[in-house]
């Protein structure tokens, strides 16, 4: 039997309209964007793209820390039918520049500190570099770009009203087999490889997510701690949640056990998506010291008491 999958952007579009005035993206202890805010910022990105001359199928690189604005820029690229190129911000600045050129990216979204460290003497395919911190123009081939974009965006409302939500989120959704992402990862050999990911793969993972994570819905919250430049974190801490109308909280700082546990306690996420390294850090720093106490060691050997201890540790963690 042939399974017909919905295009991710079609599902995202529906979520935007259904959850218009509800929170969509937050930076932990920072700014929050509702679905309306997000849709407005996406529309403003599209103005920038038009001024740069970006065309469907063109590449746009993103290299910055995890944050709400990274997600907005990523979604703006897809809803413009361009191809997103996520790059780990931990890579050396010149490597980021090389990957942007290797992918033939026309625009780079990054942090000012990263852009300042990239070698500008090399030939580049980039026509514009945009700050992820505030969406300002850091550099452009057209010296009038910042001024012309600002003038056009000034005509737009600060946030589009609900009456215009269908119009502002009327995204030009392409074919499900279109290229969505070129993902650069270090790989086992240590050299970055550009993996070409079509929307079909994203749609397939959404279907998988609905089967294994049915508890995620429009009341759910998640703490995004994995790199958005890696597909696991991007898919199951951001894209799947937004398509469900959930609220994503980004840890934009180093995800140390202390910061992670503090965020989990405050946000109270519906699920926690992690990798073994993070779980191991939490265990070594928070769980193991408790279990090694003399009284606790004894309690863990007594039927009934062991469950009380485990539940107490669990409640203190989350």
Model-found features: residue ranges?
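Conserved AMP-binding/adenylation subdomain of ANL enzymes
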Residues: 203-221, 228-312
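Hydrophobic alpha-helical segments in the ANL/AMP-binding
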Residues: 12-13, 50, 68-87, 96-97, ...
């Amino acid at each position: 039997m042939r399974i017909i999958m919905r295009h991710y952007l079609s599902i995202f579009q529906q979520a935007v309209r259904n959850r218009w005035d509800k929170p969509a993206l937050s930076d932990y202890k920072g700014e929050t964007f509702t679905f309306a805010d997000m849709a407005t910022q996406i529309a403003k990105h599209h103005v920038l793209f038009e001024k740069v001359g970006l065309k469907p199928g063109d590449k746009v690189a993103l290299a910055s820390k995890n944050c709400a604005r990274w997600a907005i820029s990523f979604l703006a690229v897809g809803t413009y039918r361009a191809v997103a190129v996520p790059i780990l911000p931990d890579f050396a600045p010149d490597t980021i520049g090389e990957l942007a050129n290797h992918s033939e990216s026309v625009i780079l979204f990054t942090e000012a500190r990263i852009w300042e460290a990239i070698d500008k003497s090399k030939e580049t395919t980039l026509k514009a570099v945009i700050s992820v911190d505030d969406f300002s123009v850091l550099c452009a081939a057209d010296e009038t770009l910042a001024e012309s974009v600002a003038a056009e965006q000034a005509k737009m409302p600060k946030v589009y009203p609900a009456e215009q939500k269908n119009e502002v989120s009327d995204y030009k959704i392409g074919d499900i087999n279109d290229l969505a992402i070129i993902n650069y990862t270090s790989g086992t050999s240590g050299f970055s490889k550009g993996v070409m990911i079509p929307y079909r793969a994203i749609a397939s993972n959404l279907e998988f997510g609905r089967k294994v994570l049915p508890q995620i819905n429009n009341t759910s919250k998640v703490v995004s701690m994995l790199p958005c430049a890696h597909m696991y974190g991007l898919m199951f801490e951001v894209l799947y949640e937004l398509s469900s109308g959930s609220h994503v909280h980004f840890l934009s700082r180093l995800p140390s056990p202390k910061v992670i546990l503090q965020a989990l306690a405050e946000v109270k996420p519906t699920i926690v998506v992690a990798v073994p390294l993070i779980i191991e850090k939490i265990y070594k720093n928070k769980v193991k010291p408790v279990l090694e106490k003399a009284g606790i060691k004894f309690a863990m050997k007594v039927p009934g008491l062991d469950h009380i201890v485990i539940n107490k540790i669990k409640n203190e963690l989350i």
